[in-house]
Amino acid sequence: MELFFCYNEGRKIRQENKMSEPLFLHSVMQEKIWGGTKLRDEFGYDIPSEKIGEYWAISAHPNGVSKVANGRYEGTDLASLYAEHRELFGNRPEPVFPLLTKILDANDWLSVQVHPDDAYGLEHEGELGKTECWYIIAADEGSEIIYGHNAKSKEELRQQIEDKNWDALLTKVPVKAADFFYVPSGTMHAIGAGILILETQQSSDTTYRVYDFDRKDDNGNLRELHLEKSIDVLNIGEPANSRPVTVKADDLRSTLLVSNDFFAVYKWEITGKVDFEKTADYSLLSVLAGQGKLTVDGKDYPIQKGSHFILPSDVEAWTLEGQGLELIVSHP
């Protein structure tokens, strides 16, 4: 809590308390050809159609900007808040809010795709590239992802794509709930049907499609592919997944899922009351299971499965309390 004083001709005339507070968010649903209803069924979100594929839970990207839902910044969009109150984010140097947290409901296969790195993305698309990672919230039995490819050179890669030799080219991996995958830029990938994922990524919406299963949109048209750009940016060699590291202390089990130049991502499992102190300029938190409360500056905030919030830089300490709470936490 910070104390502020107002003065008039050298006399103190008023005193007020400015309390630190979390930033809860109203966010944007994205309809997708492969989407479904699990965002409603699993999280209770009000979805506008039966084909909602993505919930951009914490986003300042212009294609889906979150708005603050509480406190003195209520109604302010996250992009404006970041631009006008950089002190809330540790006065970090990134010119735009650098991260995006989304939940994806893959009712059908997503396209086989790849994302560029920052240099290629800025040169060709005018925005950042995309390195991302996936935490599998739920997966139907037998669900798979595509994670990498088998080509040994760019020439072989091009030939396999031109020949549409997908079975030989693409690497399929079975998945289950609580699996984690690190997907750096340049990785061939696709999320399979029946999978619910929390994705942490750079704030970018650039995707190059390699293959889309020859399906058509609502107007009967095939979706655009981006073969030349895909071949430009695809890595050769197997992707290297991260090696999560878990530590247990009292009522907290904390797993570092990945740490790189763009973000660090953790899974917190809480079975009681845990006090925290700030170790990052700001943090993004998503509740995937359970319910409980967040306490900041003596004020309690109820949280439950489906809650998403930011702890800005002025929140020096906080408490999380609940049974069976599971959160994904990230910071730049």
Positions of predicted regions on the chain:
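An exposed, glycine/acidic-rich loop-and-rim segment of catalytic or binding clefts
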Residues: 163-169, 180-182, 188-239
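Short acidic-glycine-tyrosine-enriched beta hairpin
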Residues: 170-182, 297-314
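Ligand-binding loop in jelly-roll beta-barrel domains
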Residues: 96, 104-109, 118, 128-129, ...
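Short, structured beta-strand/loop micro-motifs enriched in basic residues and often containing a Trp
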Residues: 159-167, 291-293
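Transition-metal
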Residues: 2-152, 214-240, 265, 326
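Structured binding elements
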Residues: 285
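Short beta-strand segments in beta-sandwich/barrel cores
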Residues: 273-275, 290-295, 308
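C-terminal amphipathic alpha-helical segment
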Residues: 208-275, 279
